[in-house]
């Protein structure tokens, strides 16, 4: 949620930010109209309350002086004021709800360093690492390799759950688990993250804090009986962990890592990446979240990206980093880097991590603040999030980039201590 003060004081700046995102700036005019009405209603209510308090004092004085007729007249006026105040309080409450509902639909303001563009075609490549492998044989896609070994089963997954699910057996199941443990070890032992085990079902308020609600409810799985949502990413419980709390500056930054399955309906992605494991309704991910101060959050974002890159470098998988343009930014993000791994089956780089600084957007929704060391002033924290990394896509990248002419796949050296084997199958 962006600061209403920013909209009041600099509406043109906010409108321009929305235009750069490809959003309709008319929402801001609607917000300003309701906000003005809301503030006028508050002022009028306070004036009537003040008048009613004055009447109460005068009634007591007049009764003491024996002027009962005048006192009765004031009592009647006080009753009328009470009814007006009640009506205004109801109006104030309704306007506040309308205002809050609209504010929840306004995306974050892009940082000045974000390239301006309409869609992903205008994202800007920042750097590359490694070179895509040149095969001296025709490489197979992961959706051909896995089933050929009898270790990846899309048909039975469809029988169990419908499309966009996968069953894996034996060495592939162990490779998935090895990747999870490897990533957690790197981030906790080398990068200083605290590992967190989080719930996979969260309250409506929690997932509103992190920005998935109210705008993207159709993309979420909901357990209706208990009104609990399956998490689309561990960012949700991690970023909301300190909601309603005041932290001390000396505690920051807090760096959290969590492994969870993630659940997404993918309602808006019909027809995209329908083959294999690239776009699933359920997938594993290791997530990184920082809680930090405004002064250092963009510097911390650069470090977060490097932490995610380390995983791909250790796995020796070629990748590139791109800075998302304004039109491709996520709803909550002020700045995002995507890390894209090379996949031979697509002959292209595909996203394997998305790292974002959402500034105080989530902190305002969740009332997450910290006390400044210098003056004791309370300020909103900044939160960052990033995949460190998507496990299923890492497995896919290994299968496709490490395949051999005989149809086998060599396991990356760093994973052998975790898998206990060097070759698949």
Curated annotation (Swiss-Prot):
<protein>
    <recommendedName>
        <fullName>Serine--tRNA ligase</fullName>
        <ecNumber>6.1.1.11</ecNumber>
    </recommendedName>
</protein>
<comment type="pathway">
    <text>Aminoacyl-tRNA biosynthesis; selenocysteinyl-tRNA(Sec) biosynthesis; L-seryl-tRNA(Sec) from L-serine and tRNA(Sec): step 1/1.</text>
</comment>
<dbReference type="Pfam" id="PF02403">
    <property type="entry name" value="Seryl_tRNA_N"/>
</dbReference>
<dbReference type="InterPro" id="IPR006195">
    <property type="entry name" value="aa-tRNA-synth_II"/>
</dbReference>
<keyword id="KW-0547">Nucleotide-binding</keyword>
<keyword id="KW-0030">Aminoacyl-tRNA synthetase</keyword>
<keyword id="KW-0963">Cytoplasm</keyword>
<dbReference type="GO" id="GO:0005737">
    <property type="term" value="C:cytoplasm"/>
</dbReference>
<feature type="binding site">
    <location>
        <begin position="351"/>
        <end position="354"/>
    </location>
    <ligand>
        <name>ATP</name>
    </ligand>
</feature>
<feature type="binding site">
    <location>
        <position position="287"/>
    </location>
    <ligand>
        <name>L-serine</name>
    </ligand>
</feature>
<dbReference type="Pfam" id="PF00587">
    <property type="entry name" value="tRNA-synt_2b"/>
</dbReference>
<dbReference type="InterPro" id="IPR002314">
    <property type="entry name" value="aa-tRNA-synt_IIb"/>
</dbReference>
<feature type="binding site">
    <location>
        <position position="387"/>
    </location>
    <ligand>
        <name>L-serine</name>
    </ligand>
</feature>
<dbReference type="InterPro" id="IPR033729">
    <property type="entry name" value="SerRS_core"/>
</dbReference>
<feature type="binding site">
    <location>
        <begin position="233"/>
        <end position="235"/>
    </location>
    <ligand>
        <name>L-serine</name>
    </ligand>
</feature>
<dbReference type="GO" id="GO:0005524">
    <property type="term" value="F:ATP binding"/>
</dbReference>
<dbReference type="GO" id="GO:0016260">
    <property type="term" value="P:selenocysteine biosynthetic process"/>
</dbReference>
<keyword id="KW-0436">Ligase</keyword>
<keyword id="KW-0648">Protein biosynthesis</keyword>
<dbReference type="GO" id="GO:0004828">
    <property type="term" value="F:serine-tRNA ligase activity"/>
</dbReference>
<comment type="subunit">
    <text>Homodimer. The tRNA molecule binds across the dimer.</text>
</comment>
<dbReference type="InterPro" id="IPR015866">
    <property type="entry name" value="Ser-tRNA-synth_1_N"/>
</dbReference>
<comment type="similarity">
    <text>Belongs to the class-II aminoacyl-tRNA synthetase family. Type-1 seryl-tRNA synthetase subfamily.</text>
</comment>
<keyword id="KW-0067">ATP-binding</keyword>
<dbReference type="GO" id="GO:0006434">
    <property type="term" value="P:seryl-tRNA aminoacylation"/>
</dbReference>
<dbReference type="InterPro" id="IPR010978">
    <property type="entry name" value="tRNA-bd_arm"/>
</dbReference>
<dbReference type="InterPro" id="IPR042103">
    <property type="entry name" value="SerRS_1_N_sf"/>
</dbReference>
<comment type="function">
    <text>Catalyzes the attachment of serine to tRNA(Ser). Is also able to aminoacylate tRNA(Sec) with serine, to form the misacylated tRNA L-seryl-tRNA(Sec), which will be further converted into selenocysteinyl-tRNA(Sec).</text>
</comment>
<dbReference type="InterPro" id="IPR045864">
    <property type="entry name" value="aa-tRNA-synth_II/BPL/LPL"/>
</dbReference>
<feature type="binding site">
    <location>
        <begin position="264"/>
        <end position="266"/>
    </location>
    <ligand>
        <name>ATP</name>
    </ligand>
</feature>
<dbReference type="InterPro" id="IPR002317">
    <property type="entry name" value="Ser-tRNA-ligase_type_1"/>
</dbReference>
